[in-house]
Amino acid sequence: MLQNNHEVRIRVWEKIGLPLAFAAASMLAACGGGGGGDTASTPITPVADGGLSKVASLGKKIFSDQSLSASGKQSCATCHNPDNAHAQSNDLAVQLGGANLDVPGFRAVPSLRYLNLTPAFFFASDGTPTGGFNRDGRVNTLADQSERPFLAPHEMANDSRANVIVKLKQAAYVEEFRQVFGASILDNSDDAFNRIQLALQQYQKEDTDFHPYDSKYDQFLAGKVSLDAAELRGLALFNNPAKGNCVACHLSAKGSDGSSPLFTDFTFDNLGVPRNPAIAATADPAYHDLGLCGPDRTDLSSRSALCGAFKVPTLRNVATRKVFFHNGYFKTLREAVSFYVKRDTNPELWYPADANGVVQKFNDLPEQYRKNVNVTEVPYNRQPNMPPALSDSEVDDVVQFLGTLTDGYKAQ
């Protein structure tokens, strides 16, 4: 089960580490990602304008182009707001899309920051699922990741790739698109769509706004600033395997090569987050989002031990988030941290009780998958009436530390 693999998986990740991820990212950039077509034939060379290649500059325009949606009012930037760490700027559990912007989604919007070193999905030597994009790791490149938002009925809601290209032909930058990818590129909708994917991928890889590494914590690691007393206490609790133990999944130290910490090990965990009635789909009691084994991901549906596991996100910019976890159940960072340490000591705080007053713990999972939830690792290895791994004041300190992971810190 996933919860038994944490100690092993970190040793595995430290071995393969960031060099593997960086090599994978570089290789994908060279071959144009996995968007299909012959994207490798498109040269990607830097230009002086903003330091972006011509392909990435196109990607920047596409990223903010609302006309490529069925509503004409939604772009990538609508849900991934650059002014909020490329994440949602409201506190809705899920966003609304579709032709009339009234179709609810199924998962909270993740940030697009610090995704450029994400490796393609694989199983580590100990069997730990690792990497991939989206909360279930079902696609292997940033290029592949960009397809569904254009076509999903609850997002930009185009009915086909060809429909996206019809809209692209009316865009102000269409001639630039032809100049970069060839005069006849729009003659084949699949080829043209593949170039859209490539452009979006390159924009996210090349533009340092997606990975600036300029938080207070980055500057602290570089010896440029100091953390205050509460932040230092929070860092110690974050790293302490007997207290917060956050570092078990959210790596906080520089890599052996001096690389900045990404605050994720790219693995998956099953936390048993409460069911969120704010998501319209949950009105159907038969609906369950099982992460690695469905409903969006289908290739692992028979791997019952994986059901309920979601990808460990980076904690960079977590203090800017408006909702937390895959279903957006929690609205504040303090609530989210408190859930980690009181989920098992005080489950009544988070889960409903049945008619007999019995708390329905892990109520967003079918009964047969509740055994998959991580209950062996600190801070989850507690029982009711035991003290939580962190006191309320210690939770406050961890929250203070997490605030140091926000990009764009300016020393006073």
Short names for language-model regions:
Residues 314-412:
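Extracellular low-complexity, Gly/Ser/Thr-rich intrinsically disordered linkers
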Residues 100-205, 326-335, 393-398:
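Periplasmic c-type cytochrome electron-transfer domains
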Residues 1-62, 153, 161-232, 236, ...:
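Post-cleavage N-terminal segment of exported redox proteins
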